[in-house]
Amino acid sequence: LLELKVIADVGLVGFPNVGKSTFLSRVTNAQPKIANYHFTTLSPNLGVVDTENGGFVIADIPGLIEGASEGVGLGHEFLRHIERTRVIIHIVDAASTEGRDPIDDIYKINKELEAYNPEIASRPQVIAANKIDCIFTEDGEESPIDKLKKEFEPKGIQVYAISAVSGQGVRELLFHVKELLDNCKQEPIVFEQEFFPEDMLMSENLPYTVE
């Protein structure tokens, strides 16, 4: 089996149900399955983004969970898809609609990326702080967007407040992603031969012992 090493320019990563499929359907003509259930996406959905400065291919990577680098929740399959992209869009639920901390989520996902392959964690990232239409803050309370910017922009990771449902903030995010791609080293597309040890064992005349 010959396998395409690079499947997309950009990979969407994040925990399940943060809006990756909705984002993909917003920015491309792709029609991924969208539902309010974890693991709705079980294989990458690809779409083409067109901007004034050119287009790029984007892949909705199935939602990651803690332990993915150890194979939990089909983790190795999911991480292998991310390995084949050049820029990462990290989508988080900025409104914490499921009670999750978006800052904590980003660190957890990046920890899984680094554990699987440190080179992936070093690739250009941008944070899409999604579901801003669902954010409600008390008077004097710091907004989750400001918290994300304060945490990650000093590290060189830009944060864009977006709504995948309404499209707010999406255009600016896409232009930044295109700039990141333009500044990336273009890696050649490589075909690899898949290796399955069990096939090798079956094809060889190995000695056996009956006890």
Where are these regions (language model features)?
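C-terminal-of-GTPase-core extension/linker across diverse P-loop GTPases
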Residues: 1, 5, 12-13, 18, ...
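Conserved G1/Walker A P-loop phosphate-binding module
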Residues: 1-72, 76-88, 92, 174-178
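Short amphipathic alpha-helical/adjacent loop interface patches that line ligand
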Residues: 46, 82, 106, 113, ...
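Charged helix-capping and loop-helix junction motifs
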Residues: 72-74, 107-108, 143-146
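Conserved active-site and cofactor/substrate-binding residues in soluble primary-metabolism enzymes
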Residues: 73, 104, 168
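Glycine- and Gly-Pro-enriched alpha-helical subdomains that act as flexible
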Residues: 94, 100-107
